[in-house]
Amino acid sequence: EIKPPANPLVIPQFCVRFNDIDNVGITGAHYAGFVMLGQHGFFAPKDYDINKYFNDHLTWLNLGLGLDSSHITVHEDAWAGGGNLGPSVEFHSAGLELSNQVYMQYDVRSGKPKELNIKVLDMGQGHERVPWFTQGQETSYETTFPSVVKKLRYLTAIKPDKELMKTFLPYAAWLNIDEVVNVDDAWKRVASKVGMNVKELKPHIQQQAALYSIAEHSRALLFTINDGQLPSNVGGGYNLRVLFRRAMDFIAAYKWDVNIPDLCKLHAAYLKPIFPELSEHLDEVKKILEVEAVKYESTRQKAHSIVERIVRKDVNAETLLQLYDSQGISPELVKEEAAKQNVTIKIPENFYARVAALHEKKAQVYETKKDVVISVPERVPETNALYFDDWHAPRFKATVDYIVDQYVLLDKTHFYPTSGGQLHDKGTIGPYAVVDVFKQGKWIVHKVDAKPKFKIGDVVEAMVDSERRKQLAQHHTATHIINAAARRVLGNHINQASARKTLEKGSIDITHYSRLTEKELIAIEKEANAIIKKALPIKKSFIPREDAERLHSTRIYQGGVAPGKLLRIVDIEKTDVEACGGTHLNTTKEAELIRIISSAKIADDVVRLEYVAGDAAREWGKMSERRSAEIAGLIKKTLNLSIKVTSRLLQEAADVFNVTVEQLPDTLQKFVQQIKENEITFRELGEVHSHKLSRAVSLEQLSQDIFDAWKEQRKELEKIQEKRAAEQMKYVKENSVVQLNADVSSLREIAQKFNQILLINSDGMFVFKGSDKQFEELVKLGAKGGGKELRQGKVDDVKKVLKSFRF
């Protein structure tokens, strides 16, 4: 969709790939994170000259690398991707692929080759291979990160066997999991060439590979985390967690004293002349990796009992894959635990490639979708959207272009359609209320409250609800302000995952590795309101995509990549720049006030913030003050506790019980009362049970404590009832009419086991199982109640029923 920054173009860029992680360290040439040197050209067919591109690269190999053509092997092939296809040429020397030129010529999306209008030269060259080839080191890792490899050799006391590596490396490519059918056979072939048996060769190479993998993975993690990505259990972050845990597994397996954040620091220092930005956020990278290390250790702890059960069964590749994907338990850990039980586990050589392939199929999609689709002729012109210019909602005139039932298309409109997580505008078109607005293709569709009487071609007067527009614009601009504030407070890794803006409140999902503390929330809110107070100008403009990316980087894509050649850029001066099509204020001061009302960790690497701005913030403030005082008084009265009740914690406390803030006082009272009643029940049953509420310091902590106490009581009562029911079963037979010392739950538990039964306790509560006719006889004796298979209720005269009722 966009023009290249230059034509022809040579561009180096750091890339990550995860489909052959198992090769890293083994072949001496593979990386999860590497610099790709791209050579590109975009030409009309008449200007497309494959011979020239081939000769240009051959000249570079001759003069740049000093390679004589007799030492270069050219392998012809074909390459396809993205619906395009073309011949390719791989350049090899001494068994190593140095580069690959692809000559894209055909569009194959239809299933048949079709000549491209623009033909493309697409050459890729792994940068790390060139210095390795020219310097003649044992592997490319020594040349790519010498300081880190040197440090690891010192920490691990592992010295390279140069003679062995010199013999092994020419055949290491035979172990490439992408190209080998049977890895075990490949190891045997390599071992025979080296002059060793597999049992001698493999442990030595794998130990070296572990050292190289730790060096490589730590660099890949440094680049990606510095770029704003987080290890997690979903999406692309899953692959980063795989890298981290693979490195940690090697460290644990060989009992090495290696710290990954320290290696990242060494990488950053070595790369500073080329990538100075890697040294700017090292504290943040360290914190993120330390959190990952805690999660890793937690997984190892819980893994012991899980693996202990699993290894008793047949453990195959699918079992290992499922354990890693669902529990985060690595195959190395399974193998380690299995060995303690004298069980041998075989780990597939391509295990991590299979993990990566599994997660390529999983993706998160954030979009605004309308179920309604109306039929509009293509001749109807595109709607001219006027809402981009100014958030103030004016009265305007427009021509009716098309009408379908209650759906109206105008030649131009100020009405914003539901999109980008922001709700639509409302207002009027003529005498009709606009109840919905949505985008369909090139048109903006207005739904009115009745089939209109005006006709196509009529000029109508329309007006947008200005109060609704203002509130939505405040919430949308607040999203950008909070995103920027969170990044300043929490770190450079903060990005927007998704957002929603309604009339009542807004929400933004930010990428972060842990729950936010009250201190952090206060700091973010304070920073957001400081941005408001500065009255910063908010510039809105349409810019070609390539210019927007060049000026502001790809960070403009918050919450997803915006489509189109032209991007609408919303620029809050020196604060935040995003590609966004929503309605936005003209200055930050117009947002007036922001209050963050709740925070929740909704995914492993995502935190959701809910907030209000403008009038909604002021109304929420008044409501929360009243509610806070009410709840503080309630807690003092019922529990004799003086608890900290802040307005923001109201929502978090309500979330504990899955109720609204308005329902929270009654819910708290109900749960506390139930706890007290349960304590009485325990005493009546002669059971000792007492759960004392902790001296919680916040409303959320107390709410969680109350909920946990209630839940624990419920479980304990169920156990007691089951025990009592089991004890009293000996008094009960089929067709019995029996009085038992048990509550209704226990009576039901016993009755389930019979076809015909009537059980009554001393309070007259009964449970009945039998026919409709038999139940009618019970009703004649004064029973009141009902049900389906099991009927329950109460009788007034227990003795009368026991004496008179029979099956």
Residue ranges and their predicted role:
Residues F250-W256, I288-S375:
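Extended, domain-scale alpha-helical bundle/helix-rich regions
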Residues K3-P5, I11-F14, H30, G82-G86, ...:
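Conserved phosphate/anionic-ligand binding catalytic regions in large, soluble enzymes, centered on
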